């Protein structure tokens, strides 16, 4: 479920997302009629085009800023000033309501919160991190999400120093880039 504020803001509370994911896994285990200890692995699939900020301990610092949220529209001009054709050439995607403008919005409009953010991650990464007890330093993004980031060179599967520098975003706020099949970690007892 989403929370709405006016006609431009659409977000989701991370703790609620996590609780819903835990309940879904519990229901799947019950429906399968297996013991929780028999679960060999879990794969997360979640929304791709929005982002959220996490702290050093992996805790949510911001709500999940949905791709439906339009408050970041004023950041489009910054990106377009860089050159939309150039952004498409580097990232493989046009300027949209995805990660890039949202990150710039947090930096411009909520600098006190932006400073507390260790990494920006999509919700699937956040949920996996919670399930595995990972820290901000261990934060990751699956390379198939990079075209939404607004800051990645999708051909190289790496963060674009050129875009990050031009838009004043620290590379340290970007998570490590992984393959979709990489193992993130083990499940916590929680």
Over which residues does each language-model region extend?
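N-terminal glycine/serine-rich phosphate-binding loop of ATP-dependent small-molecule kinases
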Residues: 1-62, 89, 116, 165, ...
